Amino acid sequence: MNNSRTTSLPRLPDYSRSATITAALGTAVLIGGVALGLYSRFLAAANPVTPGDDARAELPDALGMSAIVVGVVALLIIAAVLLSARRLRAAGFGNPGMTIYLVLAAAIVRTMQLHVPSVAEQIFEHYAAFPQLPTALAAWVLVCLGILVISYPLTAVPRFTPTARTIAVPATIGLLLCALATGGALWVGDDDRFTDHRTAASVVAPQIPNRLGQERFRIALPKESTVVVGGPGFIIGTPTGITAYDGATGSARWHYLRPDAAEDGVHHEESNLLSIPSENTVLTSWNHLGWIAFDATTGEKLWTESEFADDSRSAMRVASGFGASSEPMLALVDDELFGGSYGNFARYDARTGRHMWSEPATPDGCDNMKSRIAITSLAVYQVRVCRNELSAWTTVLALDPATGAETAKRDLPNPDPDRAPKVSVQEDALSVDWAYRNAPLDHLVVSAPGLLGTAPVAADYVKVIANDPATGTLVTNSWSTGITLSQGGASDRSLTDPDAGLGGVSPFDSKLLTDELIAVGDAQLRTWRRADLVENTPPVPLGSGQASQIIAAPGIILIPFDDKSAGLQLIGFAP
């Protein structure tokens, strides 16, 4: 009997047409999901700010990387089935396609681990739209969908006998599905959908009026609003954004608004609105979005905080004065108080965000912790407390705003080196107050850096009412001298208020113009001739309400006025 007859493995049936189509479709979707995951993880723009919550901060990166890893593992399983399924089954290893269920289980566990639905919803609700998260979500959905679609053809039968047509058509459909998902994700991540941005033509800004003049317009202001100088007029900030106005006419020129701004989401922090007229720039601070800089004349967007994510500015604060409608420069410090700052001062170009220079190091013998910085339009002042074995002194340095180079220096004996003087900015003038009554030093006020060496040290506290740095003209008030106007720091050219009519003037409700000194009190405006401090009569009534600020802008003098019947208004005056 001849037993040499060979027996072969039973022939397995071919894939059905539907299984072949499903396999091609699932593979194409997987490939598209991995490609979109790579884009999300390495190319897509991330959240402009880093959320404080770890889950929110990590989700976009983690989800994109998960889509890449899980998708690649699934594609490797498909390749293993195509290349060696019959050989592995013949060796007793079973169907390798069954491992796709392990990948599917891992995807489910990863989704639960990252809390994808809830965390993604929180990010969409509280932060500005950005491409990385929606593309990561789309990639993850495509990968999971591809695994589900491919699981049946992988586990049912291990042999393929497809035709070119049965692969090309479903693969094309799968890639089109990926393209639609990508387009939808990019649309969801486009933050421009939520903004209303209108620009204006460039014009030459008019001069600040030389005197008060007459009332020209009234603009209703929201309860939560801030007014700053900017471009050829002024800019009003509200929680929804900013609108720039022409100073001469009071008409709107350009705006940048988020009409759907939410209190717990992205909204404009109007109290932080910062104008830098010397660089024709206005900076806006947005909750959960960061700083955005605009050209104050045209409204063109110049830069955003996210462009500088690699430096330390996001952890620092913009140095600004107290109650000011404009600031002289963009500078970042560790801490700030009423325009006086201490520690790690850095000067930036407001139009580009480029770092220009940093505070010079404190020399030996000077206490770095007691060093103070004050920012004015003409200089950055560094006030140091120094000592050696024989004496103690205070050094005041004037630094050039553009380069940081020293332009003036003054050393003054310090009666108590263990106490640092109070350094602040009053009406764009440097104020150094030692607060040592009956001591050699009391109060130094410097209206311009060129007067640092000659500015007198007062015997008592001096309150600056108004200042013109260009001419070194100061209007001050003190117990010993009363209201005084001094020019260039020279006492022989000082004028004392002849009728004591300025007693109610404070630094927050007065402005020194070319020809007049203006003061506001409650519901009326008073003016004095700058030449001799003689009051013009009669006072200008504003209505029934209260005003406490004067803003001198190009082409207009502005008075925010809280009218008892009409609400908050902005009143414009011009000659």
Residue ranges and their predicted role:
Residues 16, 51-66, 123-140, 209-223:
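Membrane-interface segments at the starts/ends of alpha-helical transmembrane spans
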Residues 235, 283-284, 338, 379-381, ...:
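Structural core positions within WD40/WD-like beta-propeller blades
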Residues 230-231, 238-240, 278-279, 287-289, ...:
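Short loop/turn segments that connect beta-strands within the blades of beta-propeller domains
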Residues 159-193:
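Internal/C-terminal transmembrane anchor helices
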Residues 1-106:
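Membrane-anchoring hydrophobic segments
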Residues 59-62, 98-157:
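Membrane-embedded alpha-helical segments of integral membrane proteins
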Residues 216-231, 259-278, 307-330, 361-378, ...:
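Repeated scaffold domains used in trafficking and secretory/extracellular systems
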Residues 53-55, 157-160, 196-220, 243-259, ...:
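Surface-exposed loop/turn elements that mediate protein-protein interactions on large endomembrane-trafficking
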